[in-house]
Amino acid sequence: RLMELQLAAKLGVSRTPIREAIRMLEQEGLAVTIPRKGAEVAKMTEKDMEDVLQIREALDELAAKIACEQISEEQLEELVATMHEFEESTKTDNVKKIAEADVKFHDIIYQSTGNPKLVNMLNNLREQMYRYRVEYLKDENNYPTLMKEHKDIVEGLVRKNKMQVTATMHQHVKNQAVAVKAMIQEQE
């Protein structure tokens, strides 16, 4: 539960910004308000996950396709370094650090498109994607597949092979959807 008074006290603010934050979370589908009980974090559902990942799949494939044409050598070098950073982070038990490295990897691809409207759309989707990303990254059995997909994405971008990059990005998102769907079903 999201307790207004406790959150306000903990953050040293009045209840007004807490209420506004909860309202924003509700608009994003991340919280629900139950009459006479208050707000709580929304449960992950298969339908929500499918909706979010369907949009992510289309936008990630588009970003990868554009990146094939637009990505600079400097961005490729940064992407390779971030790919290695992600691999190193998987050796820790810090899911937050792993997720940050994964977000950074994808952000480089998004930025390389040179399309601020696409980047903005992906950023707007980020908070909704984050909870599914974290669930996926909690299972270390997914790491070898993720690392191979990141490597294949980088190779495709280096070769400017749109088919390879978009196919790998498609599979990358599909693998996440399958794994998270199984986790949601286990929790029900």
Name each model feature, range by range:
Residues 1-65, 69, 111, 177, ...:
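Short linear motifs at protein or domain termini
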Residues 13, 141, 159-160:
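Residue-level signal for the nucleotide or nucleotide-sugar donor/cofactor binding architecture
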Residues 26-32, 125-127, 141-144:
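Mobile beta-alpha loop/short-helix "lid" or hinge segments that flank ligand
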Residues 36, 59, 81, 145-148:
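Alpha-helix N-cap/N′ positions at the starts of helices
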Residues 52, 73-135, 148-155, 164, ...:
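Conserved amphipathic alpha-helical segments that form helical-bundle/coiled-coil interaction surfaces
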Residues 68-69, 114, 138-139:
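Short helix-capping/hinge motifs at transmembrane helix termini and TM-loop junctions
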Residues 152-159, 167, 175-178, 182-188:
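C-terminal peripheral helix-coil segments that are non-catalytic and often amphipathic
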